[in-house]
Amino acid sequence: MWMKNLTDKLMVWVVLVLIVSTLSWAGEVKRCIVCGMDLSKYPHTKYVVTTTGGEEFQTCGAQCGLTLHLRLKEKFKSATATDLLSNRSFDAQKGFYVYKSTVITDMAPGFISFATRANAEKFQKGFGGKVVTYQEALEIWKEQMK
C-alpha cells in the first residue's frame, strides 16, 4: 500500500487542502466576451453591453463593445462606457470616441471612450486620431469588419 501510516495520509490530506484552497482563492479570471482578454487589466476602458433580455456582457473596451453591438443586432439594448480621462461610466451612445490615436488602451486600431466632446478633443490634441460620435464609430467599425 502506498500510504503506510497515518503521517503519510495526513501529509497527503494537507497538500490536497492547500491545493484546493489556493485554487479557490485565486478565483476564475473574468474575460472579455469578444476577445478573451483579462478584464482586470482594463478597468480604465470598461464597457458593458446590455441586451433586450436584460443580460449584461462586459468587454475590455469600446472596440469590442462595438463588435458585440454589431453581432447582437436587434438584441442590443444599451451600453455603458468608461471615460478615459475622468474614469467615470456614461451612456456609450451619448459619448464621443477617438479613433486611431497613437495610444492603444486595449485593442488596435482602437476606439477610446469619452463622456464629452471636450474630453475627446483634449485627448486628441495630445495623441491624434479622429473624434467621432457613437453612431459614427459604429459605422466605421462595421466597414472595418467587412
List where the protein language model places each region.
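Bacterial N-terminal signal peptides that target proteins for export
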Residues: 2-14
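Bacterial N-terminal signal peptides
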Residues: 12-22
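A residue-level structural signature of the nucleotidyltransferase/glycosyltransferase Rossmann-like core
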Residues: 56-57, 111-112, 129
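Mid-chain, structured segments of secreted extracytoplasmic proteins
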Residues: 60-109
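C-terminal partner/receptor-binding element of secreted or periplasmic proteins
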Residues: 115-146
